[in-house]
């Protein structure tokens, strides 16, 4: 059987929906990732109405929501966004790593692509300089996530189509 090329440039995504889950901690900053994501997805051919927004208390709640949403079969992709900072009580790196690892597990178990904008800085304080930096940084990361999301959904769609064609040929 001859290998078939994968068309990863197609922007045809009828009825594809994306879920965007964001933590409410540091909401003003995390909101920037959502805004950047939605704006870039529009450039990629998705309507704002193709994106459902969900808010959860903190980063730790994102993986469960991602899995429940993936299991609905409604979403082609899911994004999780949070800012995990050192509150001086526990190791924030552990929380961020746990969340990102759980998001990876969700996508592997459900075969629904999951994207992370769960970020943890080395140092964070609520001063004006840090606020501006993280506003801009989260907006940029939201845009990056959108580009990756649109590209991955195109590729996954093509791979599934290829798989279906090969199964039909057998």
UniProtKB/Swiss-Prot annotation:
Source domain of life: Bacteria
HAMAP family from the UniProt entry: Lumazine_synth (MF_00178)
Name of this chain's protein: 6,7-dimethyl-8-ribityllumazine synthase 2
Source organism per UniProt: Pseudomonas syringae pv. tomato (strain ATCC BAA-871 / DC3000)
A Pfam family assignment: DMRL_synthase
Catalytic site positions: 91
Pathway annotation: Cofactor biosynthesis; riboflavin biosynthesis; riboflavin from 2-hydroxy-3-oxobutyl phosphate and 5-amino-6-(D-ribitylamino)uracil: step 1/2
Function description: Catalyzes the formation of 6,7-dimethyl-8-ribityllumazine by condensation of 5-amino-6-(D-ribitylamino)uracil with 3,4-dihydroxy-2-butanone 4-phosphate. This is the penultimate step in the biosynthesis of riboflavin.
Residues annotated as binding (2S)-2-hydroxy-3-oxobutyl phosphate: 130
Family: Belongs to the DMRL synthase family.
Biological process according to GO: riboflavin biosynthetic process
Subunit structure: Forms an icosahedral capsid composed of 60 subunits, arranged as a dodecamer of pentamers.
Gene Ontology terms, MF aspect: 6,7-dimethyl-8-ribityllumazine synthase activity
Binding of 5-amino-6-(D-ribitylamino)uracil, residues: 25, 59-61, 83-85, 116
Reactions catalysed according to its record: (2S)-2-hydroxy-3-oxobutyl phosphate + 5-amino-6-(D-ribitylamino)uracil = 6,7-dimethyl-8-(1-D-ribityl)lumazine + phosphate + 2 H2O + H(+)
UniProt-listed Enzyme Commission number(s): 2.5.1.78
